[in-house]
Amino acid sequence: MKRILPLLIASVVSVALLAQNSFYIYKLDGSIEQYLVDEVERISFEAPEVDPDQPIEPDQPIEPEQPIEPEPQVAVLTFEDDDAKFPAYTLDYCGVDVEKWSDIIPAADQQYYGGSTLIYADWGNPDGAPYTWTDAGNTGLTHTFPYNWGTYDFAGGGMVISNHYVSLEELENVGTGGMYNYQLSILGEQTDNTFAFAYCDSKVNSDAKIELAFEDGVARQLNKMKVVMGALPIYSIINGSDFSEAYDDDDYLKLVITGYAEDGSTQQVEIMLADGQNPETWVVDWTEVDLSSLGKVTKIAFYLDEAQQISYDGGNTIYYKTPIYFAIDDLEVKL
């Protein structure tokens, strides 16, 4: 009479047919059992009995599944046409339709004071409209020239889109009389790279700060950006200019970035752009700056601090002597 062969599932490794009339059962304890096929009607696999009041102890500890953290979403302000996502707008004061970043770059031969109507159209006009740009659809940051000296022009400070380069040799050839023809330039060979080029008001403690703000007013984390000195301050640090002297060991040029939280509190990041007459300290190439210590901000403000200062009215108003220009690029925002 054939029998039913009950086997505990947890005790069996495998069942192998050895020949047409027999098979082996390999068990976890290392034993092997042989049966004739003719003796067995069927094999019945059974689960072991479990005491419902006794918790099951697993052979290996079961690690709880860790939640998968989503990758943080970031957006980068590159100022490149391929990355422009903002809706088209018009700068009415100069009749320029803006669909991409390069639409608001002053021409290379119009970098001097008063040269481009994009950034000098409203000189002396208190009701004039300011140069403005937006990165809507990407980082959400926007910038507008500050109102200063009775105008919204670049002479009062601001951040303009540029892609202009100049060599130090060319600046030395034209000297202080011609260097402002390269006012919106950084040092280097001409490339297709586009960036934001800034001028800070030369008045010490000026209220006309250069600001980048989130258009919707929501605070976000700024991760990092790149920064470099403008070509004119580098030339002036080395050679002096009509208004400044070549740097001594005690001179410096420092960029200060202030972040404003939703509650109005502030944090600052300082970047030494030039420390004395030591070229190794000069930020003449694009340099990455960590902005994470600012925390979540609704806006940031830039200003430059410099050792060389002068007063023309008996000390009532103090001005920086070195041309204070810098550029930024690749500003990363955590969304």
Question: Over which residues does each language-model region extend?
Answer:
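Short coil-to-beta strand junction motifs in C2/discoidin
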Residues: 236-255
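Ser/Thr/Gly/Pro-rich low-complexity, disordered linker/stalk segments of secreted
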Residues: 48-71
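Short N-terminal segments immediately surrounding and downstream of signal-peptide cleavage
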Residues: 21-36, 78-83
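Extended extracellular/luminal ectodomain segments enriched in beta-structured repeat modules
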Residues: 217-224, 296-297
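N-terminal targeting leaders for non-cytosolic proteins
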Residues: 71-208, 217
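Bacterial Sec-dependent N-terminal signal peptides
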Residues: 1-24, 61-68
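N-terminal targeting signals for Sec/Tat export/insertion, comprising classic cleavable signal peptides
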Residues: 27-49, 90-99
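Terminal, low-complexity interaction segments
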Residues: 77-81, 249-335
